[in-house]
Amino acid sequence: MTEIRLTNTKSRRKEAFEPIDRKNVRLYVCGPTVYDRAHLGNGRPVVVFDVLFRLLRHVYGEGHVTYVRNFTDVDDKINAAALARKDAGDPRSLEALIRERTDETIRWYHEDMDALGALRPTQEPRATEWIGAMIAMIEDLIAKGHAYEREGHVLFRVRSYRDYGALSGRSVDDMIAGARVEVAPFKEDPMDFVLWKPSDDELPGWDSPWGRGRPGWHIECSAMADGLLMKDLPENERSFDIHAGGIDLQFPHHENEIAQSRCAHPEGEFAKVWMHNEMLLVDGKKMSKSLGNFFTVRELIEEYRKQFAVNNIGPAIRLRFLQGHYRAPIDAARHYIEQASVKLGLWWHFISEHLDAPITDKDRRDILATSPVIEALADDLNTPLAVTYIDGLVSRLRGGIQKQGYVDAEMDDLEMVAKRARVAIEFLGFTFDDLEEHHGPVQLKRLKERQLSASADVGVRIGRLLEERAEARKARDFARSDAIRDRLQAAGVLIKDSRDGATWELEPGFDPAKLGEPE
């Protein structure tokens, strides 16, 4: 059986993964707050942990993995969106408007994540379906001295859990010293956080021992993870395998989840392994509406459908996410997504040219049994290495690279090379037969043109560099000539020399930023 190694945020080490129960491997990923369209950053954890889900199913069997990803459908942002509709004249009750908004947003979310090629989780609980379990957990925490009620609020007593801060590597005293926010007067300690808060007549609420109110954000995931992944376990085994999410959730959300859950069930471990994907950047900066680099998944899909006849840019977004390791930030600016789309189109083209017969289930099993893609993913989800392997196979099909370290004698059969490439692509979550429609010749041509026109002076800059190179060659300054050639090649410009001079074309992966300025 393939050994999976994962970086555990809790231990800060890469560890061999051994599930608690190989017949029921359990994964929990924090899902969205459903008040608006998913932005691009929301998509990265979905894609990253979709790959993990696929890997776990491959190793342990499809029927032996439980993947839970929740919907937070009770939140002040949701309330604000519903109140805005009511203020605009909608006569319906706030409860009806909230339900409509959350149902609508969940539908959008499914559409957008489907477009990114993500499998649906095994379970997708809504927080509002688990209010009773949250109240029961809060009552238990109060009874054990870990929580207290003040003015209709229930707060978690942070100092009652001695390991608070271990996940994020923070000290409670240092956090208090560095805090610059006003502390609510009903708190015993500035670090205590809300488990339950009161609701006025206008806001949604549920009856509880502390009055009508609604849950705090952190208790939701603790209750849902417990109820769906650990409910039938003995107290001393109250643990599940992997808890994952974006790095922005590490503190305070995941730290607070651990504190609540470990205090409610002190003999259990809650989650054995914690995984966090790093931030998404756009043009080297964190996404922000004020910087003008913020966009939703749906906005990108519609933009590329209208401008470039790409019916679904989602696979290109997915590939861009997979080109970087999940524990490193990645830039998903438009030109990188376009480069990924071009790459998908080339993958489809060269594989299709060499693949005549359909791939059988036995073919897939045999190929995956020895595939370097599985090896790469088993090594802490090394998706960049998996993509590089596919690139190597496609290069072989293109007649470019004749030998790679991982290519064996079997690779003399180009149809087998194509089969291996297609199986690898599909394992990473791409539907091969859809690539022609979304990233075929028409889209490839338009996107290559877009790459050229993305910067108005790209052609001029390349021309000037080639002129400098020609002058250097004429002066027999071959070091200078080679340096210019290397710069152009690094940027993704293919140069073809002839008696009449040099011509050029853009390769997949062209990056105008690497051209620099002519000297």
Curated annotation (Swiss-Prot):
It catalyses: tRNA(Cys) + L-cysteine + ATP = L-cysteinyl-tRNA(Cys) + AMP + diphosphate. Pfam families: CysS_C (PF23493), tRNA-synt_1e (PF01406). Its cofactor is Zn(2+). ATP binds at residue 289. Keywords: Aminoacyl-tRNA synthetase, ATP-binding, Cytoplasm, Ligase, Metal-binding, Nucleotide-binding, Protein biosynthesis, Zinc. Binds 1 zinc ion per subunit. A motif ('KMSKS' region) lies at residues 286-290. It is an enzyme of class 6 (ligase). One of its GO terms (molecular function) is cysteine-tRNA ligase activity. GO terms for biological process: cysteinyl-tRNA aminoacylation. Zn(2+) binds at residues 30, 221, 253, 257. Gene3D superfamilies: Cysteine-tRNA ligase, C-terminal anti-codon recognition domain (1.20.120.1910), HUPs (3.40.50.620). It comes from the Bacteria. Belongs to the class-I aminoacyl-tRNA synthetase family. Monomer. This is Cysteine--tRNA ligase. The gene is cysS.
